[in-house]
Design a protein with these regions (language model features):
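Glycine/small-residue-rich loop that forms an oxyanion/phosphate-binding "nest" at active or ligand-binding sites
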Residues: 63
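Short, thiol/selenol-centered motifs that function as redox-active sites or metal-ligating centers
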Residues: 25-41, 66
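Winged helix-turn-helix DNA-binding recognition segment
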Residues: 51
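Acidic, glycine/proline-rich low-complexity segments that act as flexible tails and inter-domain linkers
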Residues: 1-23, 33, 44-48, 69-81
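Ligand-binding pocket scaffold of soluble enzyme catalytic domains
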Residues: 59-60
């Protein structure tokens, strides 16, 4: 059952995501912000929760998309000048 919590003023119910999905989200966020230690820990936990290699790589691609779009848009802007 999800437990009501608060983090930096945001109210949420911890446990709303299944454990594997939560660990994949943690992993993807850690990868996106360059937190290698956190990424390794959450990758191990995701695998313990049954994450497949395909699910792990899909999470990596999701982590890359915002940065890739930003790089592309900035490049287009600069090249067009």
């Amino acid at each position: 059952m999800a437990e009501q919590k608060e983090f930096f003023g945001v109210k949420y119910k911890e446990g709303s995501l299944d454990p594997k999905t939560a660990q994949l989200v943690f992993f993807a966020v850690c990868i996106a912000i360059g937190h290698a230690g956190g990424a390794k820990r959450h990758l191990d936990k995701a695998r313990e929760c049954g994450a497949t290699e395909d699910e792990i790589w899909e999470a990596v691609v999701y982590a890359m998309r915002p940065a890739a779009a930003k790089v592309r848009d900035l490049a287009k802007e600069i090249i067009a000048q």
